[in-house]
Amino acid sequence: MREICYTNRKKSGRNDTPFDSNQGEIRRMLARRELPTEFIEWNKRWGAPSGYPPRIGQRFWGRLLSNSARTKLAGPFSIQKNSPTRRYEYPWAFYAIPLAPGMRVVDVGGGLAGFQFVLSQAGAIVTNVDPGLCAKGRGWKCDLESVHYLNRLFGTTVELRSCTLSEASLQNNAYDVVYSISVMEHVTDGEFWETANHVWDCLKIGGRFVITVDLYLNLLPFTSRKSNEYGVNFPVGELINFKTFSLVTGDVREIYGTTAFDKERILTNLEDYSLGEYPVLAQCLVLEKQ
């Protein structure tokens, strides 16, 4: 049976209508329970999503190490607690765009998560834009001192701008990639579109917006409930038609906010998706600035 998929093409009215294709790899939009081999290997290499496991006997000899040595041993993903779905999201985001040394990238709401440091180690010039505890929604501690410390520890050069994207004064048409890993569902509706506007502004023509957004199974459109303690289900599929953004590839039936979104298909195939302790799925998509 053929999948319904979406691949990048010129716009003609609304561009979220699915069509059949037998050509090329189909990129699914919702994080899957079963990881591709390269994702498993990536997580093992970088200690994602929660840091490297303790080494043999570390419970005893680890107490002799300094805090810095223990942190370095645990790796960049040990700093900030992550959802289980990140085991899919982080390698997916890394492989979504082939990185080359010198590429300028932005990590929106990167906090102290390890992904920004992996991007830097891969040769990218990384700017993390995060207001930390000053965020209006769900914030976390993220300050210049901590980022400088982690840069020294991991041999990276991440730049932190402790503010929102609207206050970051990013150069227009200057960045190759903007990453947003599970951030947009935690902001207000106004902030969502304000952020999308600034992402579009700072990207080069042909630049990519790599985004993952939580899809809560206990909220609209699956139930009548509008919000939970973590956020809301934003119709992220509407980004496909925002300004000159275009969806690169994927199955639009799995993206909330597209006309093809199929909640029944999702609910009847829950065993295929990556689920943590909380009833949430991860939507993964790549947009290109045309």
Tell me what each language-model feature is.
Residues 177-190:
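A short SAM/SAH-binding and catalytic strip from SAM-dependent methyltransferases
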Residues 190-192, 222-223:
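A short secondary-structure junction signal
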